[in-house]
Amino acid sequence: MTDYKATLNLPETAFPMKAGLPQREPETLKFWNDIGLYQKLRAIGGDRPKFVLHDGPPYANGSIHIGHAVNKILKDIIVRSKTLAGYDAPYVPGWDCHGLPIEHKVETTHGKNLPADKTRELCREYAAEQIEGQKADFIRLGVLGEWDNPYKTMAFANEANEIRALAEMVRQDFVFKGLKPVNWCFDCGSALAEAEVEYADKTSPTIDVGFPVADADKLAAAFGLAALDKPAQIVIWTTTPWTIPANQALNVHPEIDYALVDAGDRYLVLAEALVEPCLARYQREGKVVATAKGEALELINFRHPFYERLSPVYLADYVALDAGTGIVHSSPAYGEDDFYTCKRYGMSNDDILSPVQSNGVYVDSLPFFGGQFIWKANPNVVAKLEEVGSLLAHETINHSYMHCWRHKTPLIYRATAQWFVGMDKQPGQGASLRERALEAITQTEFIPGWGQARLHGMIAGRPDWCISRQRNWGVPIPFFLHKASGELHPRTVELMEEVAQRVEKEGIEAWFRLDAAELLGDEAAQYDKISDTLDVWFDSGTTHWHVLRGSHRIGHASGPVADLYLEGSDQHRGWFHSSLLTGCAIDNHAPYRQLLTHGFTVDESGRKMSKSLGNTVVPQTVIDTLGADILRLWVASTDYSGEIAVSQQILQRSADAYRRIRNTTRFLLSNLNGFDPAKDLLPPEEMLALDRWAVDRALLLQREIEEAYREYRFWNVYSKVHNFCVQELGGFYLDIIKDRQYTTGANSVARRSCQTALFHIAEALVRWIAPILAFTAEEVWKFLPGERVESVMLATWYDGLGELPADAALNREYWEQVMAVKAAVNKELENQRAAKAVGGNLQAEVTLYAEDALQASLARLGNELRFVLITSTATLAPLASAPADAVDSEVAGLKLKVVKSAHAKCGRCWHHREDVGQHAAHPELCGRCIENIEGSGEVRHYA
C-alpha cells in the first residue's frame, strides 16, 4: 500500500499541547520585565483616553491569601481589557503601611518597652519586608502594574500629602475636638473606627437594679397619688454591671406608660407593658397601683444604689420595650445615646464621670472597685448591689456584641477627648459632609447595584468620624493646642504645610522629633504639641489625594478622580466609606465614578475559609501545581457579586476548561502551518461560504465579549469563549474543515480560505483570552504567523473580522439551520455506532428525508452537504418517501436513515466512495483525491 501522508497538509505546530504553566509562566514574567511592557504601555498611552482603576491598598502584613488573589486578578482583568479596548489604563499597586497590627508585631518581637522612635523605625522596616513578599506573589499572579514604583502610605511624600489633605479639611472647618464615646479596645489601647468593629456572640450577665427614690413626693404626684406609704425604686435592666459605678441618669420614653407597682415591701416603677415578665423574673407578687406617661417622670431624682449622688430621670426616644424594664440606666461616658441625652440636659464635659482607664481598669480612686479590670469587676458590682438591697434579678444572656477585628476581644464605648470629622458640622460654605456624601452616592454607579443602598444607609446613620488614635506608628495629627484655652493655633493650616514639607524629607519622624519652638518661636511655651496619630482609614481614605494627584499623578486631567474602585463587599464600611468622606470634604465629590464589590471566598459547601476546617486554598500552592492562569480562569468564571466558591475540585474543573481552550487554540495554530497572511490571506469575497460564516460568528461574539468586559461580567466572557471553542468551533466548524484543510491543494483557494478564517479567529481569540489567561495568550501570540508587535498587550481588539453581507445567499439563519440538521445527524450516528452498525462517521451514508422547503435549502450545498455532515454520502429525499425505519429528528420536517457504506475506503481521505479502485496508478484512492494530487484540484464553493 502506498503511503500518501506526504500528499496531505497535516497540522503542525511547536505550540505545546501540555501547558506546563508552573514552569512556563515565570519565563513569560521575565519576558514582560525584559521588554518593559508596563512602561511601553504608558509610552503609547499618551493619545488614548484614560481609565483609572485606583488600587485599594492591602495591609502590609502577612502572606497573601485567596481573597487577595481574587481581588488582584479581577483588577488585572479590568486593566488588561481596558488596555485592549484602546485606553491608557495605568495600574499603580499600593500598600497600607501604618497601624496597630504592624506595631503589635514589632512589640511582640522586640518587646513593648521600646522608645517610640525605635518602634517607628522597626515598624517601617517590617512593613517594607512584608511589601516585598506580597509584591512577589502579586507579580506571580500575572498582575501587570507599576511594581517598581508602587505607592506606600508610609512613603514620605504620601505621609506629607496626607497631612496636607487633613489641613484642607481643617481649612474647611470639618475637623473638631470633642469628648464623645468611641469604640475602644483595651488591647489596642486606642479608639477604633467603625470599620474595625465586628460582632460576635458573648455571654454577659443581666441584672435588674432598683434605684431608690429621692424625690418621693414628686414621684407620688407624677402617679396622681397624695403620698407614698413605703419605699420606692425605679428599676433598670442592663447587660453591663460594670457601668453602674458610672451611672449619672435614668432614661424613660416620654410616650410609654409606666406603672407604680406595689410589690410588698416596696413600690417598683416599671413600664406597664413589662410588669408581668419583670415580676416573674423577680419571683414577686405585685399589683399596679397607678400609671403615668414617661414625660411625667422627667427630672424626678433617684439615688445611686451605693454612691452618694443623685440620678435624675431624662426623656429619651431610644428607650424601647423589646427587653428589660422600659427604663435605661445612663452612663454618659460609656454609651453614645446616654452621652447625647445627658448633653441635651446640660451636662458639661467636666461633669461626665469616666472611671475606666484606657486599659480597662477602674481608676484606683473609685470606691469599692478601684484597680479592678471591668470584666472581672462585674460579679463584684453584682454582689455590692445585692448587699445594698438593690439587686432584683441576676441572669446571663448570650447576645451579639461588638469585638475588635484584630484581637477578637470585647469592646466598650468610652468617652475620650478625640479629634473628629463632623458629619453634620456646617462648613464655612455649602452642605454638611453627610449631605455631600449622600448626594455623591447618587452620582456613583454601583456594581452590583445593591451596594448603593448599603453605603447610603451607612452614611445616613453613621456618627461623626473619630480620626485620632493614641499610637506610635501612624501619620501624626500635627496640631498645637493652646495650654489655657485648648484651642488650635490660629495658623494651624499654615503650620501643617510647614510640617508636611519636613515630613516629605524625613518622614513622620520629623514631627515627633520636632521642637515646637522651631515653628512657633516664642509662642511655643503657650502651646502643647499633641502626639495623636491618624486613623489608618484616613491613610487609605486619602490616597485619591496623595496618589492620584500626588506621588503618581494618574488621575484624570479634571482632577484626582478614579473611574473605578474595586474591593470586597466589607469595604462599604471601610475604604469606599472613608474615601467618600475625604473626597466629599476636600473636593465636594466622590473620588470614584464606579464602585465594584466582590464577595468573599467560601468552600464548595458555602462555608467560610478556616484553617480549623481544613478548607483553605493557598494561592501559592495552586500556582505551583496548576499555574496562575488556572487561578485566573477560576476567578473569571465565577460571578463575584456573591460568595465565591473555591476548592481543589472547583479548580480542577477550571483546569479542564482551560485544556479545552488551549487545545482549540493549538488546533488553530497547527492548521496555520505554512500560512503567511501577507500573501496567503484571501479577501472575504473569495472565501467559501462556511468560512465567511465562521468569521462573521467570531465578529458577533467579539461584540458580545467586548460588552461583557465593559460591564465587568467576566463569567460571561469565560462562558462565551468556552462555548465557542466547544460548540461552534469544536462541535461544528473545525470538524467540517479538517477534510478540506488536509486533503485539498496546499495553496488551493479551498485551503487558503479555511486558513484565512482560522487566522482571523485566532487573532481575535488570543485577544479575547488575554485579560484572563494572560500567560497563555502571550504564549499563543508568539506562535501566530505574520508581523506583529512583541506582546499581545501592545495590541487592541482585533479589527480584521468581516461581517456577512445582509444579502448573503447563505446567511446566518441558513447556517443555524444547517447546524441543527448536523446535530440531528450526529445524534443518529452516535446511536448507530453504539449499536455497532457503523464504525466511524465516514463509514456511514445518510439519507435526509425532508419537507420541501428544508430539502431545497439543504440542496443549495450540493455535493458538499456530505462534507458538512462528515459522512461519505449525503442524499436528500422528500419527507413523504421516508421508509418505516427512518428515524424522527428534533428538526421539524426531517427524518433520517443511516446505513453502512458498501463502498471501499479511500486510503487518503478515508471516505467510502464508489470510484475507489478505478484508477490503475492509484487503486487505493477515490477520484477526488487523485484530482487533488495529480490534477488541478477539486473546487469547493460552500464547505
From Swiss-Prot:
E.C. numbers: 6.1.1.5
Reaction(s) this enzyme catalyzes, per UniProt: tRNA(Ile) + L-isoleucine + ATP = L-isoleucyl-tRNA(Ile) + AMP + diphosphate
PROSITE patterns xrefs: AA_TRNA_LIGASE_I (PS00178)
Cofactor binding note: Binds 1 zinc ion per subunit.
Record motif 'KMSKS' region, residues: 608-612
InterPro entries documented for this protein: aa-tRNA-synth_I_CS, aa-tRNA-synth_Ia, Anticodon_Ile_BEm, Ile-tRNA-ligase, Ile-tRNA-ligase_type1, Ile-tRNA_ligase, M/V/L/I-tRNA-synth_anticd-bd, Rossmann-like_a/b/a_fold
Motif 'HIGH' region positions after renumbering to this chain: 58-68
CDD domains: Anticodon_Ia_Ile_BEm (cd07960), IleRS_core (cd00818)
Source species, domain of life: Bacteria
Annotated ATP binding sites: 611
Co-factor(s): Zn(2+)
Residues annotated as binding L-isoleucyl-5'-AMP: 567
GO biological process: isoleucyl-tRNA aminoacylation
UniProt GO cellular component terms: cytosol
Protein localization: Cytoplasm
Annotated Zn(2+) binding sites: 906, 909, 926, 929
Family: Belongs to the class-I aminoacyl-tRNA synthetase family. IleS type 1 subfamily.
NCBIfam families per the UniProt record, alphabetical: ileS
This protein's name: Isoleucine--tRNA ligase
Provenance organism: Pseudomonas paraeruginosa (strain DSM 24068 / PA7) (Pseudomonas aeruginosa (strain PA7))
Lineage: Bacteria, Pseudomonadati, Pseudomonadota, Gammaproteobacteria, Pseudomonadales
